[in-house]
């Protein structure tokens, strides 16, 4: 499997989540020192992660805005330390070009933008400048849709075209339907049922639903975030069967066997 100029063995891969934030919904405050972050990265790599997604600002509903300066202070030391110690691809989870540039200079390989270039109009130019793969996620301000799957597909197609127009090569563009972002439980569920339509847009698809509220709802409600890893793994299997190629998860080990087996059947 290729992500731009990068090659990953197999037809599917796990992206391990590393939140260096104090307020992420699942593991906020757990990895706020470089050493704690490195220890977690080492475990995720041992468990089978092929990409580490580093985030310095929580994007959960109601989260506090973080300036680019503070975000850079959080992520750059961690990215540098990971690159110094491990041979692993790193994505930077940010929608700010200033942070993204600093992360790329520090050694990050991939951009992961939860606003698909809408928040910062220079993100696509930056991706083109660095020949960096970019993940474009569906997002919007309100949970209002004519038909959620079609609207998500239209959005992703339009944003991918905007990236192409800005000089990003097609093989550097990945898409993410944005589960948990501006979508009700019902809308998330509807999108899950029609995930194959997203996978037919002509771009590789990242699946990110790990521990989110819709997983809790599918389990009947009242579960804690870390109690959702088994269901997350089941949904990873479902997504890979629908055509997704990367699953973004908190618990790498719980997903590794599924990805290893299904990767050989894709």
Curated annotation (Swiss-Prot):
It is an enzyme of class 2 (transferase). Signal peptide: none annotated. It catalyses: (7,8-dihydropterin-6-yl)methyl diphosphate + 4-aminobenzoate = 7,8-dihydropteroate + diphosphate. Its EC number is 2.5.1.15. GO terms for molecular function: dihydropteroate synthase activity; metal ion binding. (7,8-dihydropterin-6-yl)methyl diphosphate binds at residues 59, 93, 112, 176, 212, 248-250. Catalyzes the condensation of para-aminobenzoate (pABA) with 6-hydroxymethyl-7,8-dihydropterin diphosphate (DHPt-PP) to form 7,8-dihydropteroate (H2Pte), the immediate precursor of folate derivatives. This is Dihydropteroate synthase. It comes from Streptococcus pyogenes serotype M3 (strain ATCC BAA-595 / MGAS315). The gene is folP.
């Amino acid at each position: 499997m290729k992500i731009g100029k990068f090659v990953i063995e197999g037809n599917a891969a796990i992206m391990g989540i590393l939140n260096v934030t104090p307020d992420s919904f699942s593991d906020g405050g757990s990895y706020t020192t470089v050493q704690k972050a490195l220890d977690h990265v080492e475990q995720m790599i041992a468990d089978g992660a092929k990409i580490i997604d580093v985030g310095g600002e929580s994007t959960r509903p109601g989260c506090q805005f973080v300036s680019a300066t503070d975000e850079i202070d959080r992520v750059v030391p961690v990215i540098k330390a990971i690159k110094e110690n491990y041979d692993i691809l790193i994505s930077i989870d940010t929608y700010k070009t200033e942070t993204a540039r600093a992360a790329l200079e520090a050694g990050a390989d991939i951009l992961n933008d939860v606003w698909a270039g809408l928040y910062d109009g220079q993100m696509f130019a930056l991706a083109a400048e660095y020949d960096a793969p970019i993940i474009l996620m569906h997002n919007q301000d309100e949970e209002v849709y004519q038909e959620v799957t079609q609207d998500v597909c239209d959005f992703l197609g339009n944003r991918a075209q905007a990236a192409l127009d800005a000089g990003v090569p097609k093989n550097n563009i990945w898409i993410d339907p944005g589960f948990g972002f501006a979508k009700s439980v019902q809308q998330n569920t509807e999108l899950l049922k029609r995930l194959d339509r997203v996978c037919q847009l002509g771009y590789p698809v990242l699946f990110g639903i790990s521990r989110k509220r819709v997983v809790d709802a599918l389990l009947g409600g009242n579960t804690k975030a870390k109690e959702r890893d088994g269901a997350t793994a089941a949904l990873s299997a479902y997504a890979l069967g629908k055509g997704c190629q990367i699953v973004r998860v908190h618990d790498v080990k719980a997903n590794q066997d599924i990805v290893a087996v299904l990767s050989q059947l894709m």
